[in-house]
Amino acid sequence: MSSLLLFNDKSRALQADIVAVQSQVVYGSVGNSIAVPAIKQNGLNVFAVPTVLLSNTPHYDTFYGGAIPDEWFSGYLRALHERDALRQLRAVTTGYMGTASQIKILAEWLTALRKDHPDLLIMVDPVIGDIDSGIYVKPDLPEAYRQYLLPLAQGITPNIFELEILTGKNCRDLDSAIAAAKSLLSDTLKWVVITSASGNEENQEMQVVVVSADSVNVISHSRVKTDLKGTGDLFCAQLISGLLKGKALNDAVHRSGLRVLEVMRYTQQHESDELILPPLAEA
């Protein structure tokens, strides 16, 4: 490799509003493979940092790939500083993490980053599992979330199962889920969005519950029967985008849910097993 540095003028460095840290697939629409195009549709710039790189989700008959090595992962984060690409950074969002050591590396990076960006919004989707599947990450990840990432986050987006794992509390009814979410709030952690709270099965509704220190807001949406993957990643991408575009939290959550429903229906109309983003209509 030539020793000549072609691109060493940092004044020309690309800048991003968001750094998105989560999984990536070669084929499919989960993790950053759906989040990045969704964020860009909202007119925001994003850098994608992969935690795992997979051929596709495990729901196909072949499956390749795995977690990014720690040396590479820490290098990806370090390179953003070395390129001077974080001058305009406004938010970091995290999703599926490959290892507990990645979580520790990320937390150290975020702690240092916040010194230069004290108003940085950190949103954590603590991907651990769900009621149907149980825990589907490595068993040391839940404690790593509790120890390293939750103390840094302003907002988190667990499902009911993940809320139970993080708090050690039963959350199968609305009141207990709200109480568990409130137990996580702190001077830093301002809100919890429970993404799969108990809905009305008979009326085909699902609920998203927004919990903060002084309010609880229950948002109901139509339930769509589907096996599509990546809807949670899309929801978080829409949510962080809405917040950065100045939407209030409850409004951003409501709009994000509506967008996910729109994408799911559009995907079903096109008979695809992977999410397809229709054009985004500005409201």
Curated annotation (Swiss-Prot):
Keywords in alphabetical order: ATP-binding, Kinase, Magnesium, Metal-binding, Nucleotide-binding, Transferase, Zinc
Reactions catalysed according to its record: pyridoxal + ATP = pyridoxal 5'-phosphate + ADP + H(+); pyridoxine + ATP = pyridoxine 5'-phosphate + ADP + H(+); pyridoxamine + ATP = pyridoxamine 5'-phosphate + ADP + H(+)
Residues at which substrate binds: S23, H59, D233
Residues that bind ATP: D125, T157, E162, T195, H221, S222, R223, V224, T231
UniProt entry tagged with the keyword ATP-binding: yes
GO biological-process terms attached to the record: pyridoxal 5'-phosphate salvage
GO cellular component: cytosol
Family indicated by similarity: Belongs to the pyridoxine kinase family. PdxK subfamily.
PANTHER family named in the record: PYRIDOXAL KINASE, PYRIDOXINE_PYRIDOXAL_PYRIDOXAMINE KINASE
The protein's name: Pyridoxine/pyridoxal/pyridoxamine kinase
Organism of provenance: Escherichia coli (strain 55989 / EAEC)
